[in-house]
Amino acid sequence: DEARRFQPFIERAIARFRDQRADSVSRLRLTPGRILDIGCGRGLMLSELKRRGWESVGTEQSPNLAHAISQKTGLPVHSGPTLSACRFESGEFDVVTLWHVLEHMPDPVQTLREIHRIVKPGGFIVVEVPNLQSWQARLGAGVWFHLDTPRHLYHFSASQLQHTLAEQGFRTTDIHTFSLEYGPFGMCQTLLNRLTHTPNVLYRWLKRTKLQSAHKPPLHWRDTALTIACIVPVTLVAVGLEVSSAIFNSGGIVRIVAQKTHPYA
């Protein structure tokens, strides 16, 4: 299955994490509602929510990808260069989610403004992005794993994201900076990046793509050997640092749940 990007044991973990996302969405309402997942990927979370009785809708920028996801899952998946191009009705959704998507948007403020329009009064937005003011971002600087240039166009601290949401008419109801899915690994790969010449060696191992790629710098044997030698101690240090950073609200990932206020705050 070409849609599976990672090694099988990682794919199983991803499926479980998508179920956990569905759990977090389900807790926002007493009864299932209508959800839009912007940048829905393979539609794993939406499929699980559909199984639980939600009306699930997704978006992807690529028309071909949107069609393929829709064919595979049976979900309606819209495509367009911007969210506005999808032409959703005002107040159409109870919940809109963006999981590691907002940082890819050319105009995140306009995206949030459009979300405010299509969310019902009292509805929710869930946004998860890398945390620019995290310990791992500060430790990694230019080799921070989640920096991911040029794919990431913007980065936010927790306070910046909260302020931006408030300006577009959303009141924060929950915020935290620990992600079991992305936080410890992000710290681990960032620390390894400080040791190796080539970045993201471990991440490239875990993907199903070839380690040597025309689109990535070649792996040097010293980087491979250093990663193998250091992976266990660095992982232990990374987990400790990431858990500690989250205690001080400086974890690698920030997730905010916010409720629509009307009109703009």
Locate each region found by the language model.
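Generic preference for hydrophobic/aromatic residues in regular secondary structure cores
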Residues: 10-13, 77, 188-190
